[in-house]
Structures are given as structure tokens and as C-alpha cells.
Design a protein with these regions (language model features):
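A short helix-loop-beta-strand connector motif used in the catalytic cores of GNAT acetyltransferases and
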Residues: 43-59, 242-244
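Conserved beta-strand in the GNAT
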Residues: 59, 65-75
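Short amphipathic alpha-helix that is part of the acyltransferase structural core
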Residues: 1-45, 195-239
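Acyltransferase donor/substrate-recognition loop-hinge adjacent to the catalytic core
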Residues: 2, 148-229
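Extracellular structured ligand-interaction cores
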Residues: 55, 86, 167-171
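Acyl-donor binding region in acyl/amide transferases
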Residues: 81-162
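Feature marks short, surface-exposed loop/turn motifs that line or immediately flank catalytic pockets
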Residues: 76, 126-130, 178
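Membrane-embedded alpha-helical bundles of multi-pass transporters/translocases
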Residues: 19, 51-55, 69
Length: 244
């Protein structure tokens, strides 16, 4: 029998955060997250995304042992302002037992129905600044910063539940010694000249902070057309600057 437990205190949150350390113990390719940062991701005082989002965390337990976890997320800015009727899920890890993954995904469906949302998408976080995606190949390659590493059996669980791939992303690794930089240096000069661009060199954090609003605005314009993009709003900008 699988028991589903809703995380309700710091002790349970730590168990939620630490589960992958057991699941991927001994893996040469999984890169462990910084525990404090993971804990802070679910702290409303430290994560500005939680000002506009609701999250419910669940762990699955079998024989008094944690065997899976999931975060169920509603980003209300995305739902109300961007008119995207979607519930998100992330931090989704589980042993190779479909009963476990199914009961966790059922919590996403349950919350989506409760909030009258039309579809679910994941794994992803609160925004595009969190880890995203399911690894479908390259399991023998060390994980990257933006994509989550997972066991090969994950794909079968998603497909068995009835989920389909919405986007496919390809990551490539290039050795510096194999790259001829002459072409890129030439194109860089052309782009700078044509658009009258200059590098800005900063010598202190204070100088950087003066231009952070411009950087956030550029980020919003640059990635607006990306799938599942959520705009960085003013309150998030201010809180991030305050915590920097």
C-alpha cells in the first residue's frame, strides 16, 4: 500500500528535499543540488515566485519508507494574466514502481480539477529559472544545470500514465580545443558595429545592481516566446534585488 503525505513542516520538507540523494546514491551522473537552496525554494520569504503561486508538496511512502515525491504548482500570474489554464508539477522523483508515480501524478490531476484548470505540464518549476524536462537519452552523461537528471525508467512511467512530449530539446557538448573561434569573433565584431554596441564592464556589485531592472526587462523580452515562459514582474525583481 502506498501512503501519500502532504508536507506540512520543515522536518518533512527536508525529507522531501533529501529523497533524491537516496534515489541516486552511487550515480556518477546525477549532480546533487545545494540543500539550502532547495529548502529556500519553498520559503515564501526567500522565493519571490511564491508571492504569485501556490505549491503543495507530497511524498509517497511504502512500508514507512519514502519512495517518491512531487511538487504541485499553480502559478497564478500565468493562469490569470497570461490566460494559460495550466497546473504545473515538478521535483518529481520516484522508484521504479508505477503505483508510486501514478498516485503522485493523481495529486496533480486532483488539484488541477479543484482549481478548474484544463491541463497539466511538467516536470518544471515555478518559472523558466527552475529545472525543467525529462531526460530521454544520454543517461551516461553528467547532468546539466538547467535540466534535471533522471533514471531511464522515468520515460516509461510518463507514457504509461498517458502523458505525451510537448517539446523536445537537444543539448550538445563541445570541447574548446575543437572549436575554431575566428568565425565567431568576426561575426561578433560585425554585430557590434552594425548595432552600435559596446560591452559594459562592472567593477562592483553596486554597479551591477543599478542596471538590474534593465537586465530583467531584457530577459522578459528575449524569452517571451519560449514555451511555458512566465514574465518576471516588479515584485519579483525587487525581492531578488533585496536578497542579493
Amino acid at each position: 500500500m502506498i501512503d501519500i503525505i502532504k508536507v506540512s513542516n520543515n522536518s518533512e520538507l527536508r525529507e522531501f528535499v533529501m529523497f533524491p540523494f537516496k534515489l541516486y546514491k552511487g550515480s556518477k551522473y546525477w549532480v546533487p543540488p545545494i540543500i539550502e537552496q532547495e529548502m529556500n525554494s519553498f520559503n515564501k520569504d526567500l522565493n519571490p515566485n511564491l508571492k504569485n503561486a501556490d505549491v503543495e508538496l507530497y511524498v509517497a511512502s511504502k512500508n514507512d519508507e519514502i519512495v517518491g515525491r512531487i511538487a504541485v504548482i499553480v502559478n497564478w500570474y500565468e493562469v490569470k494574466e497570461q490566460k494559460t489554464s495550466k497546473i504545473r508539477f515538478g521535483w518529481f522523483d520516484f522508484i521504479d514502481d508505477f503505483e508510486v508515480s501514478k498516485v503522485l501524478l493523481d495529486k496533480v490531476v486532483e488539484s488541477g480539477n479543484k482549481n478548474k484548470l484544463k491541463y497539466m505540464e511538467g516536470p518544471m518549476g515555478f518559472s523558466n529559472l527552475d529545472k525543467v524536462g525529462v531526460l530521454t537519452s544520454g543517461f551516461e552523461i553528467i547532468g546539466t544545470m538547467i535540466t534535471a537528471y533522471n533514471h531511464s525508467y522515468y520515460v516509461n512511467h510518463y507514457e504509461k500514465y498517458g502523458l505525451t512530449s510537448e517539446k523536445n530539446f537537444h543539448e550538445k557538448t563541445f570541447m574548446f580545443k575543437d572549436i575554431d573561434t575566428a568565425y565567431y569573433e568576426k561575426m561578433s565584431k560585425i554585430v557590434k558595429t552594425r548595432n552600435k554596441l559596446n560591452e559594459v564592464n562592472f567593477t562592483s556589485t553596486r554597479e551591477v545592481m543599478k542596471r538590474t531592472n534593465e537586465m530583467f526587462d531584457l530577459f522578459n523580452r528575449s524569452y517571451a516566446k519560449l514555451s511555458s515562459f512566465v514574465k518576471i514582474i516588479r515584485s519579483k525583481k525587487n525581492l531578488w534585488k533585496k536578497n542579493t
